[in-house]
Amino acid sequence: MATDPRMASFDAVMFGVEGDPLLRSVITVIALLDQEPDRAVVRERAERMTRMYPKLRQRAVGNPISIAPPRWETDPNFDFDYHIRWRRLPQAMSSMAGVLDYAERMNEQDFDRSRPLWECAVLTDLDDGRAAVLMKIHHSITDGMGGMAMSAVLFDLTRVPADLGPMPSAPIARPANMLGRIRQGIEYEARQVLGELSTATDYAVSAVKTAVSDPLGSTLAAAEFTASAVKMLAPQGAPLSPLMTGRSLSVKFTIVEVPLPDLKAAARATTSSLNVAFMAAVVGGLREYHRQAGCELESIRVNMPISVRTEDDDAGGNRWVPARFVIPTDADDAAERIRDLLPVLREAQQDPALSMSDIVYRLLTVLPRPVTTALAGSLMKGVDVAATNVPGPPVEVYMAGAKVTMLVPFAPKAGAAVNIGLMSYAGRVFLGINCDPAAVDDPDALTDCVRAAMAEVVALGKPPKPRKATRRPAKHR
């Protein structure tokens, strides 16, 4: 009997804690097209994608009487038409606002756990003959960068779709019976115990060698490592924002767009990076939103993924670790905000605890699920804003004969009040703002504040306007 791969520890924790629905991890991406795509080509490319990346044909199956993570098992009832649906929108919903409204409702619905954890909707009859493709995928399947790698098979560089050659073979479904799942779970646990013992032995030998050669350095490193680990699992408490305290299952999607060269120029002018410039706009927007509401905001708690993905990693699964940290919001302008952010983000990216995140998540998988869910909730619901940055295609691409004019990510709130995702595409940057309406009373006002803060950041990269020469009055003799 073939054994499908198991969820990695981090993926298993994300999947398991959704016993609390506020912690759901669902990614939604909107691709706006200049015309309706060719239905046959969409089906052929999507079929090819599911064969190249088997997780798109696999369901997550638990293990009876076992603490082993869920197993990816090819769905014997895989129904392509269930996962990709075509919808003609009524005229009242044919604008971008209608697309966003449809995407919100799609995002709010949970997955059918007896099927693979992804869905797609192709919306047609939009204004000016346009169309939109909405992709919804569970975060346990892949992260943002992995998702872009998966979706590359959907895109072409010209309007005429390329011939990609023979269709790969479809994975064969070999579902295990109850006894088989019990046996596989026990075998997995036995292998894990042996692996952990080997890892512990190697670590102990290395620690002894280091302690002998550098006792002071090893003591300081151990203390720093322990402090970081404690901080990583310490409950976060209430959100730091006095305004954005509510949490719900609802979402509100909005979009901010900015030219990519302008944002890069601002990063160069401030000797920072695109990510720092992006975060400065996020912080500035939240600060102004609170100011307009007559509320003082001293700092915010941020959840930001730190990518550990390498070129050798496949597209499936997650290759990032979460960093949670507090950012002060008292800076009065964008330049000062960037200066304040540089050391904070540098420290977050170099936190020693990040290197032990896999060990921590392996520990969480063996705890009773209610305990893990409660611990995850204490970490995630105290976050004010989550922010993520994913590079998209650097040039214009086409999907089944239609040009992609906009590519916008909406990352999961997963307990936060807001998640702001950045995706670059063909010389532009799109911010997908995912607000919890229970936390953000006026999502449109927050979006305007983020847009204004982004304009302030972008202005840092533009040359100063030359002063107009003032003509002195002529002296009379």
Language-model segments: residues:
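Soluble acyl-CoA-dependent acyltransferase catalytic core bearing the H(X)4D motif
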Residues: 1-11, 19-21, 26-477
